[in-house]
């Protein structure tokens, strides 16, 4: 009986394990590439955006856009008298 006694399924299992390892490595490389690309896009948009005095910028992926226009708090902040109603 030899030390290298292989069954027919050993080669199939080895090929499957190698393919899974190659796929995992490819997914890791693709994920890193996409992450770096998103960082580059986010950085270029941050440099192009203009921020007024006292305002803070939201992170790129957390900015929510609305078709209705500015929110109520921002409109109230822009009016000179504030949100109170005068009669």
UniProtKB/Swiss-Prot annotation:
Any one GO MF annotation of this record: metal ion binding
Any one Pfam family match given in the protein's UniProt record, by short name: SNN_linker
Localization in the cell: Mitochondrion outer membrane
Major place of residence: mitochondrion
Top-rank taxon, per record: Eukaryota
GO cellular component: membrane; mitochondrial outer membrane
Membrane-spanning residues: 11-31
Keywords, comma-separated and alphabetical: Membrane, Mitochondrion, Mitochondrion outer membrane, Phosphoprotein, Transmembrane, Transmembrane helix
Residues modified to Phosphoserine: 49
Bilayer disposition of the protein: Single-pass membrane protein
Mitochondrial intermembrane-side segments: 1-10
InterPro entries: SNN_cytoplasm, SNN_linker, SNN_transmemb, Stannin, Stannin_sf
Cytoplasmic side: 32-87
Free-text function comment from the UniProt entry: Plays a role in the toxic effects of organotins. Plays a role in endosomal maturation.
PANTHER family: STANNIN (PTHR28564:SF1)
Family: Belongs to the stannin family.
Quaternary structure, from the entry: Monomer.
Name of this protein: Stannin
Taxonomic lineage: Eukaryota, Metazoa, Chordata, Craniata, Vertebrata
Gene name per UniProt: SNN
